From Swiss-Prot:
Coiled coil: none annotated. The gene is rpmH. Pfam families: Ribosomal_L34. HAMAP family: Ribosomal_bL34. It comes from Methylobacterium nodulans (strain LMG 21967 / CNCM I-2342 / ORS 2060). It comes from the Bacteria. This is Large ribosomal subunit protein bL34. One of its GO terms (molecular function) is structural constituent of ribosome.
């Protein structure tokens, strides 16, 4: 059985990156919530 986490910088950016978040309403909410909490990193 292969492991479920096969790291890839490109896939990580495309799925969880800032621009991916900003592309949807839900993603924008995620960014807003993380800004409100004062997170140092908003996205991947």
């Amino acid at each position: 059985m292969k492991r479920t986490y096969q790291p890839s910088k490109l896939v990580r950016k495309r799925r969880h990156g800032f621009r991916a978040r900003m592309a949807t309403v839900g993603g924008r909410r995620v960014i807003a919530a993380r800004r409100a909490r004062g997170r140092k990193r908003l996205s991947a």
